[in-house]
Swiss-Prot record:
UniProt GO BP: phenylalanyl-tRNA aminoacylation
Keyword check for ATP-binding: yes
Catalytic activity, reaction form: tRNA(Phe) + L-phenylalanine + ATP = L-phenylalanyl-tRNA(Phe) + AMP + diphosphate + H(+)
Name of a matching Pfam family: Phe_tRNA-synt_N
Cofactor(s) it depends on: Mg(2+)
Entry protein name: Phenylalanine--tRNA ligase alpha subunit
Length: 327
């Protein structure tokens, strides 16, 4: 028994001296492993007289429990110390300012659409929308576009079949809006449109805003006044505006609108005209009673002019260095 007390004392001393979990496990193996000192004591029971084995075995098992309890307590203490040391080394100073989350911003094209909608909204224009996959009637026929017009070829238009295509303009929204209502009409139709073109000033997908006003006694002077005021509002300065005679199948007379740049050169910004009588007839409106004007503008074109961007493709390349300039 005296020998067991000595083993327990030595084991407790070794346990207290262990400064890591690895060292503590070595102490466990030394005393409780297959070849450990207390295991050897159990194995030697066979050498004792039968009447002494029971009591000796109980004493050895008690000694094992004492050592196991000491090992568990020391392991718990070492794990707590290890955790505290780790927490101390990874302490977060809560008084420091947090990492700043960078705010996003509207895309410049979205900004332009919102400016256009705001201006015309203040004049009482509603915002209308329509499908981007359009049929030939709404994209061409109802707009007085002849069957042999170049816009109807594969070179300009993305066709699914001869009667179904990606819309080439938002003019189809004008037809659908007039089909589903009665004059007077006053609305704009912003949206994505598609044409088979790609270069510095064209992309296969771009944005348009088209507008229309149909009522009794509508005239070209009203159209000129509204577009002049819009351009001055959009560029936030008094701009010189020029209307040039032009041709569009769906308006008569038609004009293209230019603004004079700071370098003295004229820059085309939109097209417009009085709604062609055939367009009104196609939706059941009497052109003898009603007249109207329509206009259309490329959103990217206006955005390029407003912000001084010289390559339209930059708007769709998602380069954050470019987009962050518009926040």
């Amino acid at each position: 028994m005296q020998h067991l007390q000595e083993i327990i004392a030595n084991a407790n001393a070794a346990i207290d001296a262990a400064q890591s979990l690895v060292a503590l496990d070595e102490v466990r193996v030394q005393y409780l492993g297959k070849k450990g000192e207390l295991t050897a004591q159990l194995q030697s029971l066979g050498k004792l007289p039968p009447e002494e084995r029971r009591e000796a075995g109980q004493e050895i098992n008690k000694a094992k429990e004492v050592v196991q309890h000491a090992l568990a307590a020391r392991k718990d203490a070492l794990q707590r110390a290890e955790l505290e040391a780790k927490l101390a080394s990874e302490t977060i100073d809560v008084t420091l300012p947090g990492r700043r989350i960078e705010n996003g911003g509207l895309h410049p094209v979205t900004r332009t659409v919102e400016r256009i909608e705001q201006f015309f909204g203040e004049l009482g224009f509603n915002v209308e929308s329509g499908p981007e996959i359009e049929d030939a009637f709404h994209n061409f026929d109802a707009l007085n576009i002849a069957a042999d017009h170049p816009a109807r070829t594969d070179h300009d238009t993305f066709f699914f079949n001869p009667d179904l295509m990606l819309r080439t303009h938002t003019s189809g929204v004008q037809i659908r809006t007039m089909e589903n209502g009665k004059p007077p009409f006053r609305f704009i139709a912003p949206g994505r449109v598609y044409r088979n073109d790609y270069d510095q000033t064209h992309t296969p997908m771009f944005h348009q805003v088209e507008g229309m006003l149909v009522d009794e006694n509508v005239n070209f002077a009203q159209l000129k006044g509204i577009l002049h005021d819009f351009l001055c509002n959009f560029f936030e300065e008094e701009v010189e505006v020029r209307f040039r005679p032009s041709y569009f199948p769906f308006t008569e007379p038609s004009a293209e609108v230019d603004v004079k740049g700071k370098n003295g050169k004229w820059l085309e910004v939109l097209g417009c005209g009085m709604v062609h009588p055939n367009v009104l007839r196609s939706v059941g409106i009497d052109p003898e009673k009603y007249s109207g004007f329509a206009f259309g503008m490329g959103v990217e074109r206006l955005t390029m002019l407003r912000y001084g961007v010289n390559d339209l493709r930059a708007f769709f390349e998602n380069d954050l260095r470019f987009l962050k300039q518009f926040k």
